[in-house]
Amino acid sequence: MEFVYSTRNPEVPTAYSRLDAMHTSCEILLPNLEEAVARTVTETVWNLVREADRRYNRFREDSVLSILNRTAADVAVEADEELFLILELCETFRKATGGYFDISAGSRIPDRTLVLDPRTHTVRFNRPGLWLDLGGFVKGFVLEKAVREVAGVTGCALLSFGSSSVAAIGAHPLGAPWPVSVAHPYYAGRAAHTFPLENAALSVSGKDPHGRGHIIDPVTGNTLEKEELIAVTGPSAMVAEVLSTALWAAPEGERGDILSAFDGYQAWELWCRTDGRTTVVKR
């Protein structure tokens, strides 16, 4: 974990911290706080991130998600309160997005293979070969928890989880919205587009900065190959991440209908060209 406190500008002392977790670099910027307060806030946020990584990283054999993936096809598994809440939320979002947001993998048929029992808080897979991947949900979920913690202390901060999930609390210290840029997938150091954020979140889905796709088609089970990035802004980091994932997986003709069900959210297609240009299409 890295922590730097700068008083180079005495009118706006600023704390910066970075933590590598959840397969990415998480960063936080805290202007106008005393150093001791900034350290406490930072550690609170990083504890949330570490705990989420410990619990929901499917590549950790001892995570609750890995245990669920190994056993739920054989027996109903009791889930703790937070895990069950996450699974219920993901099922709600699956239905609200026409199935294009789906945490289940290993199933190439569009039926429900995940069975949740709210009476017993148990989870069961009704067919073998199924497993769950919360990678398209947990960053937004934890980021939203972190925003609540930070906003209880300060009205000015920027949190970035891997640059693909960003939340701005208040405005930039200079008064304007925070300028948050999306990296161009073909040109290192070049922005594909910049979004002004103030009390809002941004989520971006699509190819990573190396030009690789990572989202699974919920119908076929194959990795999707698409050229565009999808950027979503709105009040909730969790919902923005769900929407960017779902809209990127959905056919272009269905994106508008999906987005219309979520008040307060906007979406853009970023068509990044190999010559460095970007065409921006608002949905």
Regions found by a protein language model. Give the residues of each.
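Mature catalytic core of soluble alpha/beta enzymes
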Residues: M1-R283
